[in-house]
A protein has these predicted regions:
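A structured, charge-rich N-terminal accessory region that forms the first stable segment of a protein
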Residues: 1-91, 97-98, 102, 168-178
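Domain-exit/linker segments immediately C-terminal to small folded modules
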Residues: 104-182
């Protein structure tokens, strides 16, 4: 985004970041067009973001959750994932850092790939500032790169592995397949 905040970028592109955060159709379609996303990619983006279903429920990865299971002032993530993202390119470390959708869900407590607990990266009450990932990541990038957020590894439990698979693929061959996640 060439050094501008998400809010400034959104305005430059003709929509507000607040409208995008709340997945208003015009803002989403503008972002989809800017990113050159096809219909399947659009649906994947929305499913990993979480879409409001009324006042207190959200659809996330084909499941229905209470909003608070996904939307909180504290933003969590795996510092190892973010560090690997940063190391994957030359240039500003934050240019490649990607926030993962599953990190939003309060039931997800571990990055299964790295066996690392999710840690709170920042806590901001105002959603427009909270979800300006570019700005927030700039504030903590050096800490991520030097391992300040790193914690001891943890072996994933059967629950961690099951939840990761169900969210990632929608496949559940257990007796829980007909049960909702929340």
């Amino acid at each position: 985004m060439n050094g501008v905040s998400s809010a400034e970028f959104a305005v430059d592109m003709g929509f507000s970041i607040k409208r995008l955060i709340f997945l208003e159709k015009v803002a989403v379609e503008s972002l989809v067009a800017l990113g050159g996303l096809n219909a399947d990619e659009r649906e994947t983006l929305i499913s990993w973001t979480g879409e409001a279903l009324g006042e207190v429920r959200m659809s996330f990865r084909g499941e229905t959750f209470v909003t608070r299971a996904l939307r909180n002032p504290g933003i969590r993530g795996c510092p190892i994932c973010l560090r690997e993202d940063a190391m994957s390119i030359e240039g500003p470390s934050t240019a490649a850092m990607v926030m993962r959708g599953d990190w939003q869900l309060r039931n997800v407590n571990l990055c299964v790939q790295h066996e690392h607990p999710l840690v709170e990266l920042w806590k901001v009450n105002y959603p427009v500032e909270r979800y300006d990932f570019g700005e927030r990541l700039k504030e903590i990038a050096d800490h991520i790169l030097v391992g300040a957020f790193d914690r001891p590894s943890q072996t994933p439990t059967a629950y961690d592995l099951w939840l990761d698979k169900r969210l990632g693929t929608g496949i559940d061959t257990t007796w829980l397949k007909d049960q909702t996640l929340f």
